Every structure is written in C-alpha cells, then in structure tokens.
C-alpha cells in the first residue's frame, strides 16, 4: 500500500510540474 501511495504521489507531482511548465510556455508564447 505504501508503494501505491508513493507512486500516486510521484505521478501527481509529475502532472503538476508538467502543467506548470505547459502554462508557462503558453504565457511566453502569448507575450
């Protein structure tokens, strides 16, 4: 169960970072 929780946390962190980078690129392109 611990491994599943850590994997889910890692996946969530990766998704958050990817979204932040994607939004950042969109803002740069918008400017």
From Swiss-Prot:
A Gene Ontology BP annotation from the UniProt entry: photosynthesis
A cellular component term, taken from the record's GO annotations: cytochrome b6f complex
Keywords: Chloroplast, Electron transport, Membrane, Photosynthesis, Plastid, Thylakoid, Transmembrane, Transmembrane helix, Transport
Main localization category: plastid
Membrane topology: Single-pass membrane protein
InterPro entries tied to this protein: Cyt_b6/f_cplx_su6
UniProt keyword Thylakoid, yes or no: yes
Matches recorded under Pfam families: PetL
Coiled coil feature spans: none
Residues spanning the membrane: 4-24
A GO molecular-function annotation: electron transporter, transferring electrons within cytochrome b6/f complex of photosystem II activity
Keyword Electron transport set for record: yes
Annotated compartments: Plastid, Chloroplast thylakoid membrane
Signal peptide: none
Family the UniProt entry places it in: Belongs to the PetL family.
Role played: Component of the cytochrome b6-f complex, which mediates electron transfer between photosystem II (PSII) and photosystem I (PSI), cyclic electron flow around PSI, and state transitions. PetL is important for photoautotrophic growth as well as for electron transfer efficiency and stability of the cytochrome b6-f complex.
HAMAP family: Cytb6_f_PetL (MF_00433)
Complex and partners: The 4 large subunits of the cytochrome b6-f complex are cytochrome b6, subunit IV (17 kDa polypeptide, PetD), cytochrome f and the Rieske protein, while the 4 small subunits are PetG, PetL, PetM and PetN. The complex functions as a dimer.
Protein name, entry field: Cytochrome b6-f complex subunit 6
Organism per entry: Ficus carica (Common fig)
